[in-house]
């Protein structure tokens, strides 16, 4: 589940992740473009070769057979195939599995209401705080901000990810704007700042560990309790770990997608000082 990434959702659990083809965005820096852009870009046509027919029942059986605790819709943009996702989530929830979305967050209130009965968690990409940058991707900044607010308001566990791209969204001002917005929704929302690599049609240099650390420090200074740096395992110090915001003890130690220690398996409180840690731990 850390690969989604979710750091406060059943750490170390296996998640069966499914997806489809297509996206309502056309980001030139997409890291999943082979599946997300298949329907509009001939260069991504190989994505169609990954498709296989499977029923919701078979999906859930596969998850149970492999010891998964979660079923997650991801890879392309799940919002464009929400009916299909719900067909799977209904079966998964009945079988005792948790369900989650990994999305660009460009959702309407109607689809959020449709998904809410089945979802435990919702990961949303907050790509930039510049409206013109979102328009270049094919979306609207305000729609994404409203989705983050709504997902939190209706009780979904929300984690926000920003892919930090040199020259696109990595200015100090923009990182502050992003941090302050998330803080305005809830200081408990984890913010993942993740490293970009050159892909698809974008050729900026890769994000440095130093830049991720700087971004994380801004998030912490803005008041966020849980800030993580991702995609550079072993190079960002303790920013892969979950710390108690009160006593600062390490509660979940990670390296990349792997959980090394987890002190929240049986409790949602810090075993050292008793502070309740926001998340879905059991």
What positions do the PLM features span?
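Canonical Radical SAM [4Fe-4S] cluster-binding loop centered on the CxxxCxxC motif
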Residues: 15-48, 256, 278-282
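Auxiliary Fe-S-binding modules of radical SAM enzymes
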Residues: 167-168, 172-282
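Conserved AdoMet/S-adenosylmethionine-binding subsite of the radical SAM
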Residues: 51-211, 218
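Short Fe-S-cluster ligation motifs
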Residues: 1-15, 54-74, 274-282
């Amino acid at each position: 589940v850390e690969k989604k990434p979710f750091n406060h959702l059943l750490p170390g659990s296996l998640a069966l992740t499914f997806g489809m083809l297509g996206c309502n965005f056309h980001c030139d820096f997409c890291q999943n473009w082979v599946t997300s852009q298949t329907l509009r870009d001939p260069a991504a046509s190989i994505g169609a070769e990954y498709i296989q027919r499977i029923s919701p029942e078979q999906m859930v059986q596969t998850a149970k057979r492999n010891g998964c605790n979660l079923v997650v819709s991801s890879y392309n943009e799940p919002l464009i195939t929400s009916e299909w996702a719900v067909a799977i989530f209904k079966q998964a929830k009945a079988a005792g599995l948790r369900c989650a979305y990994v999305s660009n967050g460009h959702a309407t209130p109607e689809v959020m209401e449709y998904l809410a009965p089945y979802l435990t968690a919702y990961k949303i990409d907050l790509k930039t705080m510049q409206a013109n940058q979102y328009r270049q991707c094919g979306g609207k900044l305000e729609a994404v901000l409203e989705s983050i607010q709504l997902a939190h308001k209706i009780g979904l566990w929300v984690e926000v990810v920003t892919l930090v791209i040199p020259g696109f969204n990595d200015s100090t001002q923009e990182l502050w704007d992003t941090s302050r917005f998330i803080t305005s929704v809830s200081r408990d929302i984890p913010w993942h700042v993740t490293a970009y690599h050159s892909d698809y049609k974008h050729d900026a240099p890769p994000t440095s560990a130093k830049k991720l650390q700087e971004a994380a420090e801004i998030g912490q200074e803005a008041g966020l309790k849980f800030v993580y740096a991702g995609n550079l395992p072993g190079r960002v110090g303790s920013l892969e770990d979950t710390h108690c915001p009160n006593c600062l003890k390490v509660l979940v130690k990670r390296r990349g997608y792997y959980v090394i220690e987890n002190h929240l398996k049986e409790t949602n409180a810090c075993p050292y000082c008793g502070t309740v840690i926001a998340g879905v731990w059991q």
